[in-house]
């Protein structure tokens, strides 16, 4: 069981709602994934009619909505978007995203920290998307964020955990949930993140753009479960180039 702020989650797989070919495919994929939390770009919601064909399928599944501030370039932009999201969707949960660079969509650490501090004070449950920077993640924890969401690789790149060494440090130091976000392009990437001790992963592109998004959702569901089980079982730390026989015959042969 994973607890974030005031909610418990059985599933450690969180899903993004973008890039699906239709609302129907999205809904079926979400159901197949077993996920209980879905991110939603505020720019895709009609604020005058928030119960449109994007929001309704998610609400019908009883999932936790996590609106994000994708498109915000400054802390001020993100704070404004967050207030709109709370008003339109009736949730204080927020994925904080600030990325001024349109090419790589890398998060701005300074603006993210600034916005997080303000939004926490305003009563938001803030989950910031951030670089895999252990110092920044600790600062975000200190200002009261409910979790941190460091990237594995640039958004939508499907490159896997390019930041694995820094993710390990973040996980080791954190006293709050660590959700690996961005760059997870295959179920094996999700397994790796969970094996190293991440509390959850967020996946969008790898599922939504798969040939069969519903089947891929199921595969990611299973991958996250297996990765977490491996972590809890305790992975062997005896990684070495030198061989080590599992059943050495030395003493047996010497006794003959």
UniProtKB/Swiss-Prot annotation:
The keyword Cytoplasm applies. Catalyzes the rearrangement of 1-deoxy-D-xylulose 5-phosphate (DXP) to produce the thiazole phosphate moiety of thiamine. Sulfur is provided by the thiocarboxylate moiety of the carrier protein ThiS. In vitro, sulfur can be provided by H(2)S. It catalyses: [ThiS sulfur-carrier protein]-C-terminal-Gly-aminoethanethioate + 2-iminoacetate + 1-deoxy-D-xylulose 5-phosphate = [ThiS sulfur-carrier protein]-C-terminal Gly-Gly + 2-[(2R,5Z)-2-carboxy-4-methylthiazol-5(2H)-ylidene]ethyl phosphate + 2 H2O + H(+). This is Thiazole synthase. Keywords: Cytoplasm, Schiff base, Thiamine biosynthesis, Transferase. Gene3D superfamilies: Aldolase class I. It is found in: Cytoplasm. Belongs to the ThiG family. Pathway: Cofactor biosynthesis; thiamine diphosphate biosynthesis. Its EC number is 2.8.1.10. Disulfide bonds: none annotated. The keyword Glycosyltransferase does not apply. It comes from Idiomarina loihiensis (strain ATCC BAA-735 / DSM 15497 / L2-TR). The active site is at residue 95. GO terms for molecular function: thiazole synthase activity.
């Amino acid at each position: 069981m994973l607890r974030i702020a005031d909610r418990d989650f059985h599933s450690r797989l969180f899903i993004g709602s973008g890039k699906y070919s239709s609302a129907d495919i999205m809904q079926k994929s979400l159901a197949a994934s077993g996920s209980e939390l879905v991110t939603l770009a505020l720019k895709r919601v009609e604020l005058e009619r928030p119960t449109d064909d994007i929001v309704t399928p998610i609400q019908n599944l009883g999932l936790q909505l996590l609106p994000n501030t994708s498109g915000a370039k400054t802390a001020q932009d993100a704070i404004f978007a967050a207030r709109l999201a709370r008003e339109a969707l009736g949730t204080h949960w927020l994925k904080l995203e600030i990325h001024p660079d349109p090419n790589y969509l890398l998060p701005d650490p300074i603006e993210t920290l600034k916005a997080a501090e303000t939004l926490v004070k305003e009563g938001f449950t803030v989950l910031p998307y951030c670089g895999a920077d252990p110092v920044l993640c600790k600062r975000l924890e200190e200002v009261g964020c409910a979790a941190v969401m460091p990237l594995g690789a640039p958004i939508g790149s499907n490159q896997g955990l390019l930041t694995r060494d820094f993710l390990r440090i973040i996980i080791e130091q954190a006293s709050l949930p660590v959700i690996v976000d961005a760059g997870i392009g295959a179920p094996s990437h999700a397994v790796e993140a969970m094996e190293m001790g991440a509390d959850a992963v967020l996946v969008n592109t790898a599922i939504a753009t798969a040939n069969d998004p519903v089947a891929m959702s199921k595969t990611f569901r299973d991958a996250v479960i297996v990765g977490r089980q491996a972590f809890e079982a305790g992975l062997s730390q005896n990684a070495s180039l030198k061989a080590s026989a599992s059943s050495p015959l030395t003493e047996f042969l010497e006794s003959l």
